[in-house]
């Protein structure tokens, strides 16, 4: 063995590298068409539920929560609890009215989930926008300041209302790609949401 590569072997290797590179480079117009189809698919996604965990860091505090989110059109229910079920709360919302109930039977009401959580926790969290981000699309009614797509036309990163949203993973749910992890960042506030147990009832 001389350790030298034959011209034929080199040519074959170069051809394989070129072809594999071409397979990864999707034309921009094709990715945009894939993204439009992706958005149309999400427009039909009105009824769903998902479980997961959320890790929040804000103003020197760190909180880890279990969550279950059920969405039925414009009506939603979010159940949150700390480790071992501690501090369980339930948020029930519809346009113009949101109610938070804790395990002791106490309740509070506001016009939006952002207003409610700010009053109860002191944190500004984009719950209304998260309803859209959690299924992988830009939030309705907010300007998109930045958007990048992955090679199959799904959002890779977007920015809205000062929040940077990074989609870190996807899972197939009955033929629809839905996020398995979403990271949110705004200033010193960071929130990581790991999602599992997706269920659709929009068929």
UniProtKB/Swiss-Prot annotation:
Residues where lipid is bound covalently (N-palmitoyl cysteine): 22
Compartment list: Cell outer membrane
Matching Pfam families: LolB (PF03550)
Keyword Membrane in record: yes
Bilayer topology annotation: Lipid-anchor
InterPro entries xref list: LolA/LolB/LppX, OM_lipoprot_LolB
GO cellular component, one term: cell outer membrane
Keywords: Cell outer membrane, Chaperone, Lipoprotein, Membrane, Palmitate, Protein transport, Signal, Transport
Lipidation (S-diacylglycerol cysteine): 22
Gene3D superfamilies: Lipoprotein localisation LolA/LolB/LppX (2.50.20.10)
BP GO terms, sorted: lipoprotein localization to outer membrane; protein transport
TM ranges: none
Signal peptide, first to last residue: 1-21
Purpose of the protein: Plays a critical role in the incorporation of lipoproteins in the outer membrane after they are released by the LolA protein.
Assembly mode: Monomer.
Record family assignment: Belongs to the LolB family.
NCBIfam families associated with the record: lolB (TIGR00548)
Protein's name according to its UniProt entry: Outer-membrane lipoprotein LolB
Gene from which this protein is expressed: lolB
């Amino acid at each position: 063995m001389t350790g030298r590569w034959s011209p034929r072997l080199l040519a074959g290797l170069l051809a394989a590298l070129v072809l594999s590179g071409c397979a990864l480079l999707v034309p921009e117009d094709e990715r945009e068409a894939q993204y439009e189809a992706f958005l149309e698919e999400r427009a039909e996604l009105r009824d769903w539920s998902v479980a997961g965990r959320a890790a929040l860091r804000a103003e020197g505090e760190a909180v880890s929560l279990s969550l279950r989110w059920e969405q039925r059109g414009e009506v939603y229910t979010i159940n949150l609890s700390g480790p071992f079920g501690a501090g369980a709360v339930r948020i029930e919302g519809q346009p113009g009215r949101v109610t938070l109930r804790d395990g002791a039977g106490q309740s509070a009401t506001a016009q939006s989930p952002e207003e409610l959580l700010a009053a109860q926790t002191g944190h500004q969290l984009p719950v209304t926008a998260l309803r859209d981000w959690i299924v992988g699309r830009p939030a309705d009614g907010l300007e998109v300041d930045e958007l990048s797509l992955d090679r199959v036309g799904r959002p890779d990163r977007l920015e809205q209302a000062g929040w940077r949203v990074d989609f870190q993973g996807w899972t197939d749910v009955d033929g629809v790609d839905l996020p398995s992890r979403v990271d949110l960042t705004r200033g010193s506030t960071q929130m990581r949401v790991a999602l599992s147990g997706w269920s659709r009832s929009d068929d």
